[in-house]
């Protein structure tokens, strides 16, 4: 799954929308090599991890 960043998008809001929990924002950052999550650029295409990938990251 992919998401094209628009003005006003925040990683925590995207995590809530796609992963069900805002506090999983770091998984989207890790999956997309984002080092400065407050600096999302409109037009950037983010990869959204699958539920399986998210679970694997949570379990270590």
Regions from the PLM with identified roles:
Residues 1-60:
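Cell-surface/extracellular proteins and modules involved
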